[in-house]
């Protein structure tokens, strides 16, 4: 780690259509090889599909999906006297959002629909209704933390 300066955090610019920084961060995570216009097309296309299917504000559905996927606790490896323990720790708000975004996109990419727009919209709708692979990932993470509760006194 550098002893001199802490890296400056760059401010995320809100997305042009809905004015949401969370949506902009999501778009940046969908983006591959710096192709932001492609990522925008995918995300906005998925939100349009969500709007027609859910009959609700697509940003509200998106926020609900993120909240349903965001983990409250996770396990981190801690080495104590030659043994490695999985220690449950609470997740900071920013990391909760980052993990939720990462899991949503990974789950959408793993789906079987034909286009990424269809996959992403289906995963967002599933997550908003507490279903889908991303929600399952959150449940697995919580289950791991619960199973390792005995080691919570090793927290740092």
UniProtKB/Swiss-Prot annotation:
This is Small ribosomal subunit protein uS7. Part of the 30S ribosomal subunit. Contacts proteins S9 and S11. Keywords: Ribonucleoprotein, Ribosomal protein, RNA-binding, rRNA-binding, tRNA-binding. Transmembrane segments: none annotated. One of its GO terms (biological process) is translation. It comes from the Bacteria. One of its GO terms (cellular component) is small ribosomal subunit. The gene is rpsG. PANTHER family: RIBOSOMAL PROTEIN S7. The keyword Protein biosynthesis does not apply. It comes from Xanthobacter autotrophicus (strain ATCC BAA-1158 / Py2). One of the primary rRNA binding proteins, it binds directly to 16S rRNA where it nucleates assembly of the head domain of the 30S subunit. Is located at the subunit interface close to the decoding center, probably blocks exit of the E-site tRNA. GO terms for molecular function: rRNA binding; structural constituent of ribosome; tRNA binding. The keyword Ligase does not apply. NCBIfam families: rpsG_bact. Pfam families: Ribosomal_S7 (PF00177). Belongs to the universal ribosomal protein uS7 family.
